[in-house]
Regions:
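Short amphipathic secondary-structure patches
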Residues: 2, 37-40, 44, 52-108, ...
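N-linked glycosylation sequons
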Residues: 22, 66-69, 73, 87-97, ...
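Alpha-helical assembly-interface signal, strongest on the long, hydrophobic N-terminal helix that forms
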Residues: 1-72, 154, 158
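Short low-complexity stretches enriched in small and charged residues
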Residues: 13, 53-56, 82, 195-200
Length: 316
């Protein structure tokens, strides 16, 4: 009579072991779903904070790494309150790295050991500042590279300057009107710009040229335009940045002139800073820095083609 009892006890023990094993698996799966999901959400939240920090800090580059660090830390901790201060480094003058980490609690997973009481989640973001190789919303006014503020001279920005266009001496002018509909790698390929009228130039000044335009190409210089529309266009943009192509060379073919465009500058016309008559054409204002957010990454900053207009992109 003892044999059946022993067998029942043995079977009962096996059932208990089986149930415990099943419960362990079920709890493990629940931990994977609940805790794993929680940890992934924490990591995504942390990554968003790191991305925001890198993009914000990059706006201070290349001249102010201290300011970039302060801005990045502020943005990171605003977007994820309570996290430890991220580590901010600069691989080069135009790049900022933000490495952040925090802990996320375990709920069910902690039954498998104290190591799962909390887990460390990490995030890394890298933002890069570059010079746009293409520019949108460009005004049809080119400025000489020796007059535009270089990014390597930050004290130049905000200083009042007057730029002059003299049709009788285009090659020595510090600004010039451009035909933005034609550009080429060949210096004189665009020919005459006589088909571009004053109303068209006014529209480009007020609204910017609608297409992205390339640097490192030649553009035709527009002369003989109607004075009134140009003046009205400039008046409509007083106090707001105008994007000027920057030229370094002048070529000519007969009576036609061409500027070689190497980069982009942002210029703000001051109130009362417009003198645009038949023989006296001047603009008074200041150059400023500008961050373009809707352009692809471009060339190296702080070089000969960097005049303070930058684009910022997340590269990691």
């Amino acid at each position: 009579m003892r044999r059946p009892s022993s067998r029942l006890q043995k079977d009962s023990g096996q059932v208990i072991v089986f149930v415990v094993a099943i419960l362990t698996v079920v709890i493990g799966m629940a931990a994977l779903v609940i805790d794993g999901g929680s940890w992934r959400r924490a990591q995504r939240h942390l990554q968003t904070a790191a991305d925001a920090a890198a993009l914000a800090g990059a706006q201070n580059l290349p001249t102010d790494q201290s300011g970039a660090t302060s801005t990045a830390l502020s943005y990171a901790q605003t977007n994820y309150p309570g996290i430890p201060a991220p580590t901010v480094t600069f691989p080069d003058t135009g790049t900022i790295d933000v490495a952040a980490q925090t802990t996320a609690p375990g709920i069910l997973a902690r039954i498998y050991g104290s190591v799962f009481n909390t887990v460390t989640v990490r995030a890394h973001a890298r933002a890069q500042v570059s010079v746009p190789l293409y520019m949108k919303n460009v005004a049809p006014v080119a400025v000489k590279n020796t007059v535009a503020c270089a990014a390597t001279n930050p004290g130049c920005y905000g200083q009042t300057v007057t730029v002059v266009f003299d049709e009788s001496q285009v090659s020595s002018s510090t600004i010039g009107l451009l035909n933005l509909t034609c550009h080429s790698t060949a210096s004189t390929a665009c020919g005459s710009s006589s088909g571009i009228g004053g109303s068209q130039l006014q529209s480009w000044i007020e609204d910017g040229y609608p297409d992205a335009l390339p640097a490192n190409e030649w553009y035709g210089v527009k002369t003989g335009e109607t004075v009134g529309p140009i003046t009205h266009g400039f008046e409509a943009r007083i106090g707001t940045p105008l994007f000027f192509p920057v030229f370094d060379q002048v070529a000519s073919s007969g009576s036609n002139y061409f500027f070689h465009i190497i980069g982009w500058a942002a210029f703000v016309i001051h109130p009362g800073g417009i003198t645009w008559g038949p023989h006296d054409r001047r603009l008074t204002g200041h150059f400023t820095t500008f961050i373009a957010t809707d352009l692809a990454s471009g060339g190296q900053i702080s070089g000969a083609t960097d005049f303070g207009v930058h684009t910022i992109t997340l590269v990691q």
